[in-house]
């Protein structure tokens, strides 16, 4: 075990994490040069397109160091985005060290900081890796100073590399062997293994990625998931090189995979403890928690015929990603669809993009919302996932919404614009620290303000330089109301949103104006209203077509003309009372793009 090194790679998006993993594999000759391709560990099409890592990946590398000892290096390539921060924390718990990759041209970013602090909490040995030193704009000394001043760790063991050109990779491998400690554990103890991640394989069922802390896992033994008590018989155990390779057993300190004919990824919770069903360990490994979605959105197929196809597609995606939830719902305006829960906005985008590309589904999405807590006057507390389920306002005592603690890292030049943006979004400043030419701004913000366009606006006002990290920071009471959109006296449930009362009139007017442009004119007048309870706060009218019923008349008595106009008036009145306004799907999609 003394020659095993388990380490994770921590980096912000686009700082060269997956490229560095490619170079480490090349240096250790883990992959046939003919099969080598960029971002080898990012297996999903969407990961390669967006240049992001969504699922944790692992690879075992064999390395002969300068001391002529043979070492086994287990590398875990973790997601970098805030939505997947729990997966990162479990990947880090499986390791003893981390490579902190920082772009020599951009310096530290907010999400890098958040993940480094998680690594420090796990008592990791951290090796700073300053990447992209081949670029003319690289400033490695400034980045070293940032790492020392902001994170407070030594940069004496920092390694300067160019993942693109392969410069410094040999020195980095020597540093991994020298500075990262070997794993601790006892093969003779009862089995205790950490579930790092899981995914679905069409032939093997659910494949589980594990780090064995104590004991060993062999094929044929019966294992138990400690969070739910489910028992399974292990069929295969193996390692990734990065190809799957079966082995006879996984021993304490090692990272690998197992299969056990598990049919549902829902039974395999990231962070769970796996033990021997016949001789179980007595305690969980620390840090396990059930993942809960924080952003909710309804998905409806544009064609009602595709409802069953959407259900099957969501079930297939759920096999690989059990962190999103879905349940069927129906809307009077949009028909049958699903109410889905996600870990964040990137998670929502990834799932909807996969539905579009992999399953060829055209979807209508409702406005994203968060989970509100409604305290009733009878002291009961309800959780509101969908604005259409809002109870009678007269029975509500107060409403609470989730707040987050956001860290924004940006160049000092843009601090004024970003503070203005945070204040617009009802933010409360917690801290502001300047390091070198960068500022770290900490704000408390309502999550509902973040899920719309905050990230886009932040990038816009900072010319793309700001980076954001956030974590849920409890619930707070707030002045919230349900904004309803009423068309010709009928409420359109798909357009209902929960909103902060002082912003309701502006948002209501924006939606009404947008709908006025989008709804086609009918033979009768269409009233579009935004209302809170029974009170209308904004109104627009779509004027009717006017058919010239008197065109066929020439000369004669004016009473004939009056009679025809009166008949038209009565017809329009009857039409208005029985006519249903036909709102095209595109109108919903456009109206919901209105930003609060």
Swiss-Prot record:
SUPFAM superfamilies listed in its UniProt record: EF-G C-terminal domain-like, P-loop containing nucleoside triphosphate hydrolases, Translation proteins
EC number(s) given by UniProt: 3.6.5.n1
Keywords on record: Cell inner membrane, Cell membrane, GTP-binding, Hydrolase, Membrane, Nucleotide-binding, Protein biosynthesis
Residues annotated to bind GTP: 14-19, 131-134
Root EC class: hydrolase
GO MF annotation, one: GTP binding
Coiled coil: none
Broad class of where this protein is predominantly found: membrane
Ranges for domain tr-type G: 2-184
Superkingdom of the organism of origin: Bacteria
Pfam families, per the entry: EFG_C, EFG_III, GTP_EFTU, GTP_EFTU_D2, LepA_C
GO BP annotation list: positive regulation of translation
Sequence similarity: Belongs to the TRAFAC class translation factor GTPase superfamily. Classic translation factor GTPase family. LepA subfamily.
Protein name: Elongation factor 4
Organism, scientific name: Neorickettsia sennetsu (strain ATCC VR-367 / Miyayama) (Ehrlichia sennetsu)
Annotated gene: lepA
């Amino acid at each position: 075990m003394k020659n095993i090194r388990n380490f994770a790679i921590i980096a912000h998006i686009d700082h060269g994490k997956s490229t560095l993993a490619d170079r480490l594999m090349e240096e250790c000759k883990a992959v046939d040069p003919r099969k080598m391709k960029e971002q080898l560990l990012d297996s999903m099409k969407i990961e390669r397109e967006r240049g992001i890592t969504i699922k944790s990946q692992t690879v075992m590398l064999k390395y002969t160091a300068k001391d002529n000892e043979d070492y086994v290096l287990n590398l875990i390539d973790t997601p970098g985005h805030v939505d997947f921060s729990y997966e990162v924390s479990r990947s880090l718990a499986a390791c003893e060290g981390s490579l902190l990759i920082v772009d020599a041209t951009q310096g530290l970013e907010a999400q890098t900081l958040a993940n480094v602090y998680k690594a420090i909490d796990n008592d990791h040995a951290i090796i700073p890796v300053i990447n992209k030193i081949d670029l003319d704009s690289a400033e490695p000394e400034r980045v070293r100073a940032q790492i020392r001043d902001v994170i407070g760790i030594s940069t004496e063991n920092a390694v300067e590399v160019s993942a693109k050109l392969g410069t410094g990779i040999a020195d980095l491998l020597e540093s991994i062997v020298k500075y990262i400690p070997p794993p601790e554990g006892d093969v003779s103890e009862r089995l205790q293994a950490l579930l790092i991640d899981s995914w679905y394989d069409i032939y093997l069922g659910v494949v589980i990625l594990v780090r064995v802390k104590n004991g060993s896992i062999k094929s044929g033994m019966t294992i138990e998931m400690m969070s739910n008590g489910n028992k399974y018989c292990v069929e295969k155990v193996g390692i990734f090189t990065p190809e799957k390779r079966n082995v006879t057993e996984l021993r304490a300190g090692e990272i690998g995979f197992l299969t056990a004919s598990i049919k549902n990824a829902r039974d395999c919770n990231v962070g769970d403890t796996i033990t021997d069903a016949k001789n179980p360990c007595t305690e969980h490994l620390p840090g396990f928690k059930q993942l809960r979605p924080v952003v909710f959105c309804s998905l409806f197929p544009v064609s009602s015929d595709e409802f069953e196809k959407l259900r099957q597609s969501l079930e297939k995606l759920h096999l690989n990603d059990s962190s999103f939830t879905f349940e069927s719902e129906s809307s009077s305006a949009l028909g049958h669809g699903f109410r889905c829960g996600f870990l964040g906005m990137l998670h929502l985008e990834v799932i909807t993009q996969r539905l579009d590309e992999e399953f060829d589904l055209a979807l209508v999405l409702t406005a994203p919302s968060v989970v509100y807590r409604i305290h009733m006057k009878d002291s009961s507390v309800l959780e509101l996932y969908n604005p259409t389920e809002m109870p009678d306002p007269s029975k509500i005592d107060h409403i609470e919404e989730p707040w987050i603690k956001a860290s924004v890292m940006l160049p000092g030049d843009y601090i004024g614009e970003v503070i203005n943006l945070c204040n617009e979004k009802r933010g409360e400043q917690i801290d502001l620290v300047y390091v070198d030419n960068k500022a770290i701004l900490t704000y408390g913000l309502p999550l509902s303000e973040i899920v719309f366009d905050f990230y886009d606006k932040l990038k816009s006002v900072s010319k793309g330089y700001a980076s954001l990290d956030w974590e849920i920071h409890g619930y707070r009471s707030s002045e919230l109301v349900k904004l309803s959109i009423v068309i010709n006296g009928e409420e359109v449930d798909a357009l209902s949103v929960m909103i902060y009362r002082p912003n309701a009139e502006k948002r209501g007017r924006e939606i009404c104006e947008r709908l006025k442009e989008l709804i086609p004119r009918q033979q009768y007048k269409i009233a579009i209203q935004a209302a809170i309870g029974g009170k209308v706060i904004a109104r627009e009218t779509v004027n009717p077509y006017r058919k010239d019923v008197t065109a066929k008349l020439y000369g004669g008595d004016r009473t004939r003309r009056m009679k025809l106009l009166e008949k038209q008036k009565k017809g329009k009145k009857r039409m208005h009372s029985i006519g249903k306004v036909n709102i095209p799907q595109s109108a919903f999609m456009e109206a919901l793009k209105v930003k609060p």
